[in-house]
Amino acid sequence: MAAKIKKGDKVVVLTGRDSGRSGEVIQVLPKEGRAFVRGINLVKKHQKQTQNQEGGIISKEAAIQLSNIAVADANGKPTRVGFRILEDGRKVRFAKTTGDQIDG
């Protein structure tokens, strides 16, 4: 299946405690069906002190299910993603709500 959400996409969270918030995709894990989104689903991690890093409690992003996020269109609203083949043979993604091209 083609990737509907890619690294660098602007996405909106649909469900969960961060519902309605938006952020940029940092990393996608297609086999697990999860993605990391900057500033979303933050968890506290207890970091042990090392020689080059001090210890303490740090906040970092945790993975979020791909089904709980949607690509944001030009207006910042969640949209479904479709695929189109252009005249020159390239396959590009487009927003189903507005019809605008997402990449390419």
Swiss-Prot record:
Instruction: Write out the similarity annotation.
Output: Belongs to the universal ribosomal protein uL24 family.
A GO molecular function annotation here is: rRNA binding
Which InterPro entries does the record associate with it? KOW (IPR005824), Rib_uL2_dom2 (IPR014722), Ribosomal_uL24 (IPR003256), Ribosomal_uL24_KOW (IPR041988), Translation_prot_SH3-like_sf (IPR008991)
What are the recorded Gene Ontology BP terms?
translation
Q: How does it assemble?
A: Part of the 50S ribosomal subunit.
The protein here is known as Large ribosomal subunit protein uL24
- GO cellular component annotations of the record: ribonucleoprotein complex; ribosome
User: Gene symbol?
Assistant: rplX
Q: Keyword annotations for this protein?
A: Ribonucleoprotein, Ribosomal protein, RNA-binding, rRNA-binding
Q: Which Pfam families match?
A: KOW (PF00467), ribosomal_L24 (PF17136)
Species name? Methylobacterium radiotolerans (strain ATCC 27329 / DSM 1819 / JCM 2831 / NBRC 15690 / NCIMB 10815 / 0-1)
What does the record give as the function of this protein?
One of two assembly initiator proteins, it binds directly to the 5'-end of the 23S rRNA, where it nucleates assembly of the 50S subunit.
**What taxonomic lineage is listed for the species of origin?**
Bacteria, Pseudomonadati, Pseudomonadota, Alphaproteobacteria, Hyphomicrobiales
